[in-house]
Structures are given as C-alpha cells and as structure tokens.
Amino acid sequence: KSVDDTIVIDFGSTKSSICKSVINHKNRSNFIASHPIAGTEYSGPHAAHFGLFDNKNVIICDYKKTKTKILDNALEIFLKMKMNVSYMDSVSHDKHIAYVSHLSHLSSFMLGKTVMDEEKNEKNIFNMAGSGFESTVRLAKSSPKMWADIFDDNKINIIKSLDDYIKNLEFFKLLIESKKFDELELLLNKTNYIKKILKGIN
C-alpha cells in the first residue's frame, strides 16, 4: 500500500495528549485515535483471548481530522471485530473516562492498599474476604506501570474526579458519624439506580 492508504490506529486509554502531539503531522489524516472499552486486569500477550472485543464499545476521537477513506477502512476493521462504534472529541473523552474508568482503577488500588496496611496477617484477608472484596480489588491486579502512565497523562481530570469522590466519601462518613441512617439509606437507594444504567449498557 502507499502511504496514503496506511492506517495508524491508537488504542490507548487517553486521547487528548496524543491527538495534540500529532495535530500538525503531515500524515495526521491517516491517524485514528480510538479507545476500545474492553480488556481485563491482565496484561501482555498471554492475556489475549478470543472474543475480547465482541459487542464492546470503541470510541473514536476527533474523527473529522481523519480522511474519509481511512476512517471507513478503520470502521470496517472494528465492525469485523464485532465492536460498537461511537464518536467523541478527545478532551471530553479524557474528562469522562477519568470518572468511569480511571477512578475505579484508582479506587481498587487504594482499597487494596488500605486493607493490606491494616491486615498485616495475610491469612485474615484470605479467610475473611468474600466475593465482594475480590471483585472490588480485581482491578488492582492491573499493570502498575501502565496505570502509573495513565494517571500521569490524565492527571488533571483524575484529580478533579478524585476530589469529587473524596467529597462523597467524607459526606458518607459524616452521615455515619451523625447517625443519620435514614438519610444514608436514601443516598444508597438513589445510588442503587446505577444498576439500571449498567444493565442498559450490558
């Protein structure tokens, strides 16, 4: 193929910085900035498995900067991978992904740290931790190197999402301390609505 037909696709978790870095590149129109919302807590070639992308979403950012022919070819690839395609600008992508992905990974890492700091005897963790704990800290098994890089690259949005999360945790703590358990239950009921949202996604 000629250079004009070459497709370069980025699959990283952040989009704004890489889109800025190539904005003036002579072959920018051959570039696809995408983020497949798929994966597991495992990394490396050994973690690959068939059907990983089936019915998963892939977000393409700043698509208007890509040539129509290149975009069409990329869409053909994604559709053959059985993925659902959506579009978003790179700045908005990084803002929202900080809340729905990066914050959950950060929380998983820090929950794991909190428990390990308190429970020096690993046997206590093994004997007492149930499926809820296991599912919540599952993401803490992810690659530390990769996630340190992600937290660095999207630090402004992650700090904002973390500030919001800490405010909610402090409010939750205050409700317990002040014994406002009716208000706490109401808060839990409102938050429980997220299961309907996630059911619609899945």
Language-model segment annotations:
Residues 1-46:
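Rossmann-like NAD(P)(H) cofactor-binding subdomain of soluble oxidoreductases
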Residues 50-138:
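Internal alpha-helical scaffold of NAD(P)-dependent oxidoreductase catalytic cores
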Residues 122-191:
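Interdomain hinge/lid region at the active-site interface
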Residues 196-202:
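Long, positively charged, glycine-interspersed low-complexity recognition regions
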